[in-house]
Amino acid sequence: MGIKGNDSRIDNIEFAVSDIARSKDFYGTVFDWRFTDYGPSYCEFTYGRLTGGFTLGEVQPNGGPLVILYADNLEQIQKRLEQAGAKIVIPIFAFPGGRRFHFTDPDGYQLAVWSNN
């Protein structure tokens, strides 16, 4: 699991989800992630440097760290998210060094997307 590298770096992000197929469809459609299934209750996702997994379990969308993804074009990725059924919970806003917005996925996890463009 993950890519071997330096000690002490974050290597993997895992989401407990209620439906692995739905999560694969959502993230694959919007972000073009690729998947490797490891049995019926675990699926690894990868895209570039990012590695993580979906595991069947109790969904806990609140109280964890905020996962922030990057996109060159925020408006384009926001449109793709909305078409895939995501809810935009914080619209695009500017901050020193870039812009970002927050959305919730099908299991209710809140994630953000940022850009320096």
Model-derived segments and their meaning:
Residues 1-24, 65-67, 117:
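N-terminal beta-strand motif that seeds the catalytic metal site of vicinal oxygen chelate
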Residues 23-27, 81, 108:
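Conserved active-site tyrosine of GNAT-family acetyltransferases
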Residues 31-37, 87-92:
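Short secondary-structure junctions
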Residues 33-65, 111-115:
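Conserved short beta-strand elements that form part of the metal-binding/catalytic scaffold
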